[in-house]
C-alpha cells in the first residue's frame, strides 16, 4: 500500500481522479435491518416497515431502506484502497458538502459502493481531503442510489 504524508499536498493531489475505485463488498438490506434502524431513529413510516401495505400502497411494490440507513452503512462497504495517509496526529470528519438520495434501495437487495478522491487542499487547520462516494443497488450499477461527498481534515 502506497503511503502519503498528510502534509505533502502535491503528492496527495496525484490521487485526484475522475476514475472511481473498484466495487466494495456487498451489504444485504433485510427487513430486520430496516426495522432496527426505524426503531433506533423513530422513523417508522410504513414505506420502510410495513411490507404488506407497501406491496399495494407503494410505487415500488415493496418496502425500501431509509436513505440515511444507506448512508450509515458506508463504513461496511469501504473498498480496499491502494493508498493511505500517514504522519498525522488527528483526522477529523469535517462533514459533507453534498448528499443526494438519487434512487430507491428495495428491501431484499444488496448494495455496494465505490469512490474517488475529488479534492485535496491545504487549509489553516490541516489537509482537506474530499472523497466522493456512490452507493448502488447491485445489478443497477448505471445509476447510484446515493451520492455523498465526505470531507476529512488531517492535522
Where does each model-flagged region fall?
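Short alpha-helix capping/helix-loop boundary micro-motifs
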Residues: 96-101
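Hot-dog-fold acyl-thioester-processing enzymes
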Residues: 1-93
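Hydrophobic alpha-helical segments
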Residues: 44, 81, 103, 132-133
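HotDog/MaoC-like acyl-thioester-processing domains
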Residues: 1-18, 105-155
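Short, surface-exposed secondary-structure edge patches
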Residues: 61, 102-103
Amino acid at each position: 500500500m502506497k503511503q502519503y504524508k498528510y502534509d505533502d499536498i502535491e503528492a496527495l493531489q496525484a490521487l485526484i481522479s475522475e476514475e472511481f475505485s473498484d466495487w466494495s463488498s456487498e451489504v444485504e438490506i433485510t427487513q430486520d435491518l430496516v426495522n432496527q434502524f426505524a426503531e433506533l431513529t423513530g422513523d417508522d413510516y410504513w414505506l420502510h416497515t410495513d411490507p404488506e401495505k407497501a406491496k399495494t400502497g407503494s410505487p415500488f411494490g415493496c418496502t425500501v431502506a431509509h436513505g440515511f440507513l444507506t448512508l450509515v452503512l458506508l463504513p461496511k462497504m469501504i473498498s480496499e484502497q491502494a493508498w493511505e495517509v500517514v504522519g498525522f496526529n488527528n483526522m477529523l470528519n469535517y462533514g459533507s458538502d453534498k448528499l443526494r438520495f438519487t434512487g430507491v434501495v428495495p428491501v431484499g437487495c444488496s448494495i455496494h459502493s465505490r469512490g474517488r478522491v475529488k479534492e485535496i487542499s491545504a487549509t489553516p487547520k490541516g489537509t482537506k481531503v474530499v472523497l466522493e462516494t456512490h452507493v448502488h443497488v447491485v445489478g443497477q450499477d448505471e445509476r447510484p442510489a446515493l451520492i455523498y461527498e465526505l470531507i476529512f481534515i488531517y492535522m
